[in-house]
Amino acid sequence: MDVKIEESWRQHIGEEFDKQYFVDLTNFVKEEYLRTPCYPPGRLIFNAFNLCPFDDVKVVIIGQDPYHEPGQAMGLSFSVPDGITFPPSLINIFKEIQMDLGTPMPATGDLTRWARQGVLLLNATLTVRAHQAASHQRKGWEEFTDAAIKVLSKDKEHLVFILWGGYARSKAKLIDTSKHLILESVHPSPLSANRGGWFGNHHFSRCNAYLQQNGITPIQW
């Protein structure tokens, strides 16, 4: 199948596009986008990959599925376009960065600046029906994004995989911990974060310390 995705990713996971599950997934997604509002916009479905080529990946932050309200989803986990009100989870991410690194709250929730530095902001499910969380789960996206995680683990070294919440933490089994660092905590959503285990996890400083120990330029969070 002809899927528009950044070329280095095509070289590493392009074989997925010809598998039956992906053909079925593509047909499902096309039908959904024709029938009902879905997010993100079609041109941004593979935004995480297109903004962060395979060879540039340093950090992987795994989310579950896209924001499902108008104007929010942009193909990057946790990110919202410039001018959009910060969702609660993103506010808590920025609060932790502020406490951890002293970086002030940014003016925008657009995390493209992270992606361009080598942070793969990967949702396990890349599309969603408007107003219906998890509506495109178990249609094939998870198999595709698991393949991406596996090939990153296999073909690269010294990556930092950041897993927030039970769903993301279930992906730890796909990652070779002899070559990579996994940072885990509860999810930054208020429901989880306010029970403890989110604030003070120091994931951003710990991530950068690991990168620097391995001669890799740290992320400007």
Task: Annotate each PLM feature.
Residues 1-13:
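Generic N-terminal amphipathic, Lys/Arg-enriched alpha-helix
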Residues 3, 15-163, 168-170, 175-176, ...:
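A polyanion-binding, active-site-adjacent surface
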